[in-house]
Amino acid sequence: LRLTGDQLLAMLSALANPHRLRIVAALQKDGRNYVSQLAREVGISRPLLHLHLQKLEEAGLVTSKLELSSDGKALNYFEVAKFEFELTPAAIAQAAKSLTDSGK
């Protein structure tokens, strides 16, 4: 996967936080999960988890899907998005060529 400079910055920025790394790791290990369960597993509050999930989703690292449980409650499930990229000096140089003003 060839990333633009802005995409690479968003992904690296999103992963530059220990909570977000743990969230991605937990979702990778256990598969999709909903916010309350994931907050317990990662050991952070639901509001803080929401902020981190939003950042991860904006970077394209996780996806969400709203579903109804058997008792009619709306649950927002999150899972790791399929992504793979090789971080090499050449890949960074290539991505840097496409940086926009917002990626400075």
Language-model segments: which ranges?
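Long, low-complexity, charged/polar intrinsically disordered regions in eukaryotic proteins
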Residues: 1-6
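N-terminal helix-turn-helix DNA-binding core of bacterial DNA-binding proteins
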Residues: 7-45, 67-69, 74-79
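Conserved segment of winged-helix/HTH DNA-binding domains
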Residues: 29, 69-104
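Short, hydrophobic-biased segments on the C-terminal half of alpha helices
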Residues: 53-54
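Glycine-centered, phosphate/nucleic-acid-interacting loop/turn motifs that mediate DNA/RNA or nucleotide
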Residues: 60
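Short beta-strand "wing" residues that participate in macromolecule-binding interfaces
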Residues: 64
